[in-house]
Amino acid sequence: MRPRSRAGDKFMSQGQELCHEYFQLTAPCEKQPCIDMCSSKYKTGKGVCGPAVHQCFCTFSCTV
C-alpha cells in the first residue's frame, strides 16, 4: 500500500456544514484508494483526486 500523506501536508477548512481536508500524497492519487482513505477516516467522507496530481481531497460532514 502506498503512503497516504506526509505529516504537515494536510489542512482543514470548515464551512457551514461540510468540512474539507487535503492529503498531500507521495505518489499520484488513485481514485479508489482516495475514496477508501476518506471513508475510513470520516464516517461521512467522500474522496476525490485533485486538484493537483498528488492530492486527495476529502469532504465530510462537520456535524457528525
UniProtKB/Swiss-Prot annotation:
Cystine pairings recorded for this chain: 19-62, 29-49, 34-56, 38-58
Any one GO BP annotation for this protein: defense response to fungus
Pfam families hit by this protein: SLR1-BP (PF07333)
Keywords annotated in UniProt: Antimicrobial, Disulfide bond, Fungicide, Plant defense
Taxonomic source organism: Arabidopsis thaliana (Mouse-ear cress)
Protein name, UniProt field: Defensin-like protein 123
Similarity section: Belongs to the DEFL family.
